[in-house]
Design a protein with these regions (language model features):
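Conserved core of the sugar-phosphate nucleotidyltransferase
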Residues: 128-218
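Short beta-strand-to-loop acidic/aromatic patch adjacent to the donor-nucleotide binding site
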Residues: 115-125
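Hydrophobic packing residues within well-ordered alpha-helices of enzyme cores
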Residues: 62-66, 134, 228
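Short phosphate-binding loop-to-helix
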Residues: 70-115, 216
Length: 243
């Protein structure tokens, strides 16, 4: 069986509620957390390694709540996303407090990934079919054409809306089956006729519930890390405040 990894991004500060950390909050009848379902679905789809991207200060609680259990059923690695883990020549601004985002999180796992991998958020539920489709893409034989063969799982906007308020989604731009861009769109609400985004200036934009959106589920390869490193350095050279 080909080696493939599930990479779970759980280092984000996220929302704290009650006394716990969002990513570790139980949601199941037997105390399961969302990651339990994600890992179950991923292993069933064929992934055979789990990489947790966490903060160092969360390690003890993370291992206790989920890590030690998962170590009994599959290979597990822990890596740490830190604010000052930046490319050579860059330093963290003194006033920087929030994580740098998905790109830096994935780069934190570079040293433990030699196989194709799927990246997900720790606190999102994706469903079994998404893992199967991404896994099948990652293990299929690709043309030796010098291109990066990577993918993103797209979800119909209407299936990702909440009855309890707004959501933020990445609206996908697709041409001939190829993803050409993703526009992060905030304050998307379900409406009687579909969906709409409400802007800070009071304007409203109607959205098509059939549109594909990103839920931050990516199928990537080790070769992509070099591209990501270069892109992250270029980004840091520009407007850091927008990260």
């Amino acid at each position: 069986m080909q080696k493939t990894a599930l990479v779970i991004m759980a280092a984000g500060i996220g929302s704290r509620f009650g006394k716990g950390i969002k990513q570790l909050a139980p949601v199941g009848t037997c105390g399961e957390i969302i990651m339990d379902y994600s890992i179950h679905d991923a292993l069933e789809a064929g992934f055979n390694k789990v990489v947790f991207i966490i903060r160092k200060d969360l390690e003890e609680e993370f291992r206790r709540v989920i890590g030690e259990r998962i170590e009994k059923i599959t290979e597990v690695e822990y890596v740490f996303q830190e604010l000052d883990d930046l490319p050579e020549g860059f330093t963290k601004p003194a006033d920087r407090t929030k994580p740098w985002g998905t790109g830096q999180a994935v780069l934190a796992a570079k040293k433990v990934l030699d196989e194709p991998f799927i990246v997900i958020n720790a606190d999102d539920y994706y469903g079994k079919e998404a893992y199967v489709k991404v896994h099948d893409y990652l293990v299929q034989e690709q043309q030796k054409d010098g291109k990066l063969h990577i993918c993103m799982a797209g979800f119909r906007l209407g299936n990702t809306l909440s009855d309890n308020g707004s959501v933020t989604r990445g609206i996908c731009h697709i041409e001939n089956g190829q993803l050409t861009g993703v526009t992060e769109t905030h304050d998307i609400f379900k409406t009687a006729t579909g969906a709409e985004s409400r802007n800070a200036d009071g304007s409203v934009q109607e959205l098509d519930v059939k549109d594909l959106v990103s839920m931050n589920m990516w199928g990537l390869t080790p070769d992509f890390m070099e591209v990501l490193e270069k892109g992250f350095a270029e980004f840091l050279s520009g407007d850091r405040k927008s990260v």
